[in-house]
Structures are given as structure tokens and as C-alpha cells.
UniProtKB/Swiss-Prot annotation:
Name of the molecule in the record: Protein PSY3
Signal peptide: 1-25
Sulfotyrosine: modified positions: 51
Originating organism: Arabidopsis thaliana (Mouse-ear cress)
GO molecular function terms listed in the Swiss-Prot or TrEMBL record: growth factor activity
Length: 71
């Protein structure tokens, strides 16, 4: 056949990456806040809501009066 070496390499790379993409397509990476994902071998509970609502820092007390702190 009249295929060049570069077209064979390109075809091999295309097939390799297509196979890699299709074989990993069953793995879902997008999760809602709390979602249970079941894979035939194992199950995994994912929680992306790790932090509470933002509040002011109760321990922060800025210096009073003047331009800055005295040492």
C-alpha cells in the first residue's frame, strides 16, 4: 500500500487515544453535592460541601485608635 510512515503513526495515535477515551467513558467525574456512585467493584460516597457558610472571624480584633499598633 502507499501509506507513508507519518500517516501510520497518526493513525496509531488516533486509535490509541480513541480507545483510551472510550474505555474511560464509564467513569463519571461530575458529581452533585452528595452523590452515590456505584462501580461494579466498589461504591463511593462523595460530598463536595465541605465548608459551612462564611462568617466574620471572631478572633480578629483590629487595633483601636491611632494609625497602627504600638509595640
Amino acid at each position: 500500500m502507499g501509506y507513508s510512515s507519518s500517516s501510520r503513526i497518526g493513525l496509531c495515535l488516533f486509535l490509541f487515544f480513541t480507545f483510551a477515551l472510550l474505555s474511560s467513558a464509564r467513569i463519571s467525574l461530575s458529581f452533585s453535592e452528595n452523590e452515590m456512585t456505584v462501580v461494579p467493584e466498589r461504591s463511593l460516597m462523595v460530598s463536595t460541601n465541605d465548608y459551612s457558610d462564611p462568617t466574620a472571624n471572631g478572633r480578629h480584633d483590629p487595633p483601636r485608635g491611632g494609625r497602627g499598633r504600638r509595640r
